[in-house]
Amino acid sequence: MTDKEFFDKSLTLSFEFSRYVIAHSEIDEQIPKGALVVLLLEDDPEFNERAIELAQAQRETGQPVVIVRIQRLLPPTESRLVNPKLELVSSL
């Protein structure tokens, strides 16, 4: 896995986890303030190894750590718009 691939996957997981937490506020309540959150993918041991190494390097003394084990990441959808219709008009 290249550095770029690791960065891209980390960014995607962080974004998706943030969206998940916004939709499921009970998750946010389980994360201690100031915790280091480490996102791991069940089907990607190479990514997980790098994520853990990075977390170990970044963790501050006494900082709580929360491991989030993600079963899988669904493929992205291109858009959430449903059947948009365009209309060319000469004026409003």
Predicted regions and their residues:
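Terminal, compositionally biased segments used for targeting/anchoring and flexible tails
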Residues: M1-L92
